[in-house]
């Protein structure tokens, strides 16, 4: 069956404590680890936080599986490909833009083989920082799975649909949707045809919904629209299954004789989820001025400093612009934060040329940026009538309080060397 025809069942809500059974009666009642689990399953806890973390931040799940995860051969180092550990990044304060990262169809590769680190800061070993990756894939992961010891993946498909099998069940994630797969969760990705997208990986805190403050109880990304899988297991024995682990930026491999997707039931609040970006309820000025992009925050991964994020996931979705006496495109800016932008589809409102779907840009801490010359001069002459950012346009930003370096691959490949020229048409227009 084609991926577009597949539809899965989900549970609704963000951060909920769920329970799910693929076979009725397989969840123990009133306890987590009975002497003998129903149907003689194994009980296994997956912890997303320290045991002593404050209760309101505590994330963990109990999984009831046919065989425990520990049954595998020793993990051995393998070629990490274009995934890097952030120890030897290039420093470049310039405005950077990348042309679309190609999908090499002449070299069939799966999701893990197509991971490419672009930028990052901090390190997984100290549980602080983030990494930004591109992924491409032309084939599915057959008898192969992946889990990440370093951090949580926020995955943004740009081209193609991901059919993701996890220990917790299945998710179908298409372009225009996102998913989060947290540290330690085993998953496998199936694709049909050329596939590409972006990943923001956070090493410290987990993603959460931003506080709404004076906005109130509703708006932006609503909790009910986040979907988590329901239990779905497969009993495969006597096979050769390869499990890949990312550990401190390096890849390791082990084999096992059974499918890791053998969880018959589970309960808890540490589980993957997906979200449809078209459900984002936009808040904006209906009088004057261009408000700050924080109003478009979908998810945030906070640092220990209140109000400061290791990573914010921000989108620039279809919406109405109605401000009076206002320069409506994004303003010229020097930011204490780092801004990595990508384009899912369409045209970004501040860059009419050169910023393409599947590419990206990085504006680092205090590096000036803003609308290009053509956008600026068009905006200051435009009739200020209500205008719709079209439905075909969808850009996003990974914003971080950390100063990002770029990988060797990103430094040497697909850089738009002429990016700086898009501002050179901005002249002295003053009447002084």
From Swiss-Prot:
Give the matching Pfam families.
HgmA_C, HgmA_N
What pathway is this protein said to act in by its record?
Answer: Amino-acid degradation; L-phenylalanine degradation; acetoacetate and fumarate from L-phenylalanine: step 4/6
Q: Catalysed reaction(s)? A: homogentisate + O2 = 4-maleylacetoacetate + H(+)
Q: Name one GO molecular function term.
A: metal ion binding
Which residues does the record give as Fe cation binding sites? 333, 339, 369
What enzyme category does the UniProt record give? oxidoreductase
Q: Name one GO biological process term.
A: L-phenylalanine catabolic process
Coiled coil ranges: none
What EC number(s) does its UniProt record assign?
Answer: 1.13.11.5
Q: Know the name of this protein? A: Homogentisate 1,2-dioxygenase
Q: Which organism is it from?
A: Dictyostelium discoideum
Instruction: Write the gene name.
Output: hgd
């Amino acid at each position: 069956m084609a991926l577009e025809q597949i539809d899965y069942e989900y549970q609704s809500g963000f951060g909920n404590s769920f329970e799910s059974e693929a076979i009725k009666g397989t969840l123990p009642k009133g306890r987590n680890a009975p002497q003998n689990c129903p149907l003689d399953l194994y009980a296994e806890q997956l912890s997303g936080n320290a045991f002593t973390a404050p209760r309101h931040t505590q994330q963990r799940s109990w999984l009831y599986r046919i065989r425990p995860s520990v049954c595998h051969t020793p993990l051995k180092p393998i070629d990490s490909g274009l995934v890097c550990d952030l120890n030897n990044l290039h420093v470049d304060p310039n405005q950077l833009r990348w042309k679309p990262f190609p999908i090499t169809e002449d070299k069939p590769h799966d999701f893990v083989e197509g991971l490419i680190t672009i930028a990052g800061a901090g390190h997984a070993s100290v549980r602080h920082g983030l990494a930004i990756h591109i992924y491409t894939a032309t084939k599915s992961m057959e008898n192969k799975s992946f889990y990440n010891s370093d951090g949580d993946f926020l995955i943004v498909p740009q081209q193609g649909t991901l059919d993701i099998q996890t220990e917790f069940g299945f998710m179908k994630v298409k372009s225009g949707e996102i998913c989060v797969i947290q540290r330690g969760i085993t998953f496998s990705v199936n694709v049909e045809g050329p596939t590409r997208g972006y990943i923001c990986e956070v090493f410290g805190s987990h993603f959460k919904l931003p506080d709404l403050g004076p906005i109130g109880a509703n708006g932006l990304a609503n909790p009910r629209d986040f979907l988590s899988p329901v239990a779905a297991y497969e009993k495969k024995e006597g096979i050769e299954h390869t499990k890949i682990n990312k550990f401190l930026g390096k890849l390791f491999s082990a084999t096992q004789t059974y499918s890791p997707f053998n969880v018959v039931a589970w309960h808890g609040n540490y589980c993957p989820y997906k979200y449809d970006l078209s459900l984002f309820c936009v808040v904006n000025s209906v009088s004057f001025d261009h408000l700050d992009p924080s109003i478009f925050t979908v998810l945030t991964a906070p640092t220990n400093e209140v109000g400061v994020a290791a990573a914010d996931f921000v989108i620039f979705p279809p919406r109405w612009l109605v401000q009076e006496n206002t320069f409506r495109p994004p303003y010229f800016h020097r930011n204490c934060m780092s801004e990595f932008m990508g384009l899912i589809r369409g045209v970004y409102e501040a860059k009419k040329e050169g910023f393409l779907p599947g590419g990206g840009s990085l504006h680092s801490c205090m590096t000036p940026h803003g609308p290009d010359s053509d956008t600026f001069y068009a905006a200051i002459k435009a009739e200020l009538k209500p205008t719709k950012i079209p439905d075909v346009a969808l850009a996003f930003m990974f914003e971080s309080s950390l100063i990002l370096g770029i990988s060797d691959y990103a430094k040497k490949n697909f850089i738009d060397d002429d990016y700086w020229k898009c501002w050179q048409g901005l002249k002295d227009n003053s009447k002084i």
